[in-house]
Amino acid sequence: MALLLITRFTLQEAIRRRLFLAVIILSALLLLAFTILVSIAINFFLSNSNTVNNSTVSPQLYLLSSGVFLDILMIWLAYLLSSLLTIVMTAGMISAEVEAGTFAVIVPKPISRAEIVIGKWLGNALILSIYTAFLFFAFLAVIYWKTGYWPPQAFSALGTLELGTLALLGLTTLGSAFVPTIVNGAIALVLFIGAPTASIVQFVVQVISQVQSQALQNIATIINLIIPTDALWHGTSFSLLPSANVFPILNLSTNNFNTPFTSTQPVAPALLVWVAFYILVLPLIAVLRFQRRDL
């Protein structure tokens, strides 16, 4: 089947690219550096635990609460890495091949344009999803090893994280069918940065004025509909938190996580429906555009 053939070629091409190899090596080095730093910090803490023992928090609970913050910090880093890799790898998914003249050779053969787009989308989706899951479980495993904390909703967190990657992939697939590679990458990057920027502005205005601006909330909602990655990240951060009844035990408060980067509320079901529509429809629009595009 031509679709699976294109998918296999896309996977092989991604693996052969120096960019992907460099990202894998850098990710492994980052994971190693993180493991060493956390080990040093935890060992230093345990060797000086007499200070903590004189307080109301035991060393074990202190480590668990530290694990919560480390989970959010490192999975946020995994979210950034997978998102940036998505933009860099897929901004030229279609446009770069058109510019290089590759499709002029492939398309006359018995391979439909729809199979080319969907096959390339599927290949990139597979490799990006595997990379995201690898980072997710690698960081969680290190943190669990050193602190003993494992999120009770880890698989829900992974699910929303993967949805964010696929949503961004849908956006770059659509853009690659309409505009040149550099323009597509720039648009995706600006939108990706714009979503959390809107959240930060909304948070700052709310803190300063003590009043929630409806206009800013509407703008943030529109941006989250255009690119739902930031809203999905907030859902991921919620799933990384411990159960509500564990917060007092760990000497934590939900107020600690009401920030522009984290959330104490799950993803709204309506947003999940929109994201599913987004992930499926944007590549289909790219197919329709590619059907009419000159090669």
Named regions from a protein language model:
Residues M1-A28:
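Aromatic- and glycine-rich beta-strand/loop motifs that create alpha-glucan
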Residues L5-E13, E115, T259-S263:
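Cytosolic juxtamembrane amphipathic/interface segments immediately preceding
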Residues E13, S95, I106-P108, L168, ...:
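Helix-capping/transition residues at the boundaries of transmembrane alpha-helices
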Residues F20-A28, T181-S199, Q217-T221:
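Pore- or pathway-lining transmembrane helices of multi-pass membrane proteins that form conduits
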Residues L31-A91, V117-A188, A220:
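Secretory targeting signals
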Residues L37-V68, F192-L288:
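Terminal transmembrane helical anchor/hairpin motif
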Residues L77-V98, A276-R292:
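Transmembrane alpha-helical segments in integral membrane proteins
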Residues G92-A125:
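Helix-loop-helix units of permease transmembrane domains in multi-pass membrane transporters
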